[in-house]
Amino acid sequence: MPEETLLAFDFGEKKIGIAIGNTLTRQARPLEIIFSEIREARFARIGQLLQQWQPQRVVVGLALASDGGEQPATARCRRFANQLRGRYGLAVELVDERGSSMEAQRLLGTHAPDDAVAAAVILQRYLDALP
């Protein structure tokens, strides 16, 4: 598999956690949190990050219910993934994000904003599943 840079998103209506990683090292790390409820401001910042990091694909956490079923947040994550695909023409992968925020809190050891760490957890799951 050729080396690829990846960005991952832990999508929320109030904030979006972002992580970066690549297929060579197969390691993910938190990048930043976008604190904005204004859609265009979010996409402006995402566009800047995409230009800066030039990822070949992006990963979006899919908010499934605890039983694995869909819930209202699942549709919002799918819509966000479709917007990324449509606006930027990137390959988008969806990854089950169940438990990522709890794991992020455990890793942080605090109740600080954990969205970027949760995005790194989601991306690490994707990288770990690669052949």
From Swiss-Prot:
Alphabetical list of Pfam families matching this protein: RuvX (PF03652)
Primary location: cytoplasm
Subcellular location as annotated: Cytoplasm
Gene Ontology BP term (one): rRNA 5'-end processing
InterPro entries (UniProt xref): RNaseH-like_sf, YqgF, YqgF/RNaseH-like_dom, YqgF/RNaseH-like_dom_sf
Assigned GO CC terms: cytosol
Signal peptide: none
Protein EC: 3.1.-.-
Source taxon at top rank: Bacteria
Entry similarity comment: Belongs to the YqgF nuclease family.
Name under which the protein is recorded: Putative pre-16S rRNA nuclease
Source organism per UniProt: Bordetella petrii (strain ATCC BAA-461 / DSM 12804 / CCUG 43448)
